[in-house]
Amino acid sequence: MLNFLSAKVGEALYDHQWDAKRNAEGTKTVDLFDGFDTITEKEITAKTISVANGNMVNVDPSTINSTNAVEVLKTIYRAADPHLRRLKTQMFVTPSIYDAYCDDYKTTTGAIPYNTQFKQTFVEGSENRCEIVPLSNKAGSKYIHLTTKQNMLVGVCQEGDDESVAVEKHEAFRLLFVMTMFYGVEFETISKERLLVAGKVTA
């Protein structure tokens, strides 16, 4: 039972890895920490992620569909800093954008877009350096993130007595599952050499 409940907590944390927004008064998983999209929004507001800084490109993901997805994702990739383009990267997208890319690619070329050997889909023209990664927990996101795996940090505390899992009985026929833990996400760096965000730029 503990394993099952712990797994459900893990699923909830994963579901909100992007859209979580820290609210000290909240009681839901989405209130526990700032997710990657929330961090991105704060950095855009602070102008540390911007077109001028080279770590953002003005592309509205909501405009991507099955007739333009290939060209738009190529445009995003080509806007990345040369240092970033030299690295093995991932382009994190919503499932709908991935589906649009696959449909557009097949319509345009008559072929499937993914590498049959590795079952991975790469941005056309990236020489298999930029993998398109659809994430169910990114559905509805206003951003596309192009970066390296190493730049996406997930932090937990696994030492000491600060984390605990327990089942407590406070009244008849009722058990409480109590978990105390530390959890958070962050970009290792938002420099243009490691990160490019695609999103709609507002004045």
Describe these PLM feature segments.
Residues 1-75:
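Alpha-helical scaffold segments that mediate packing/assembly in large oligomeric complexes
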Residues 72-76, 97-100:
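Non-catalytic alpha-helical scaffold/packing segments enriched in small hydrophobic residues
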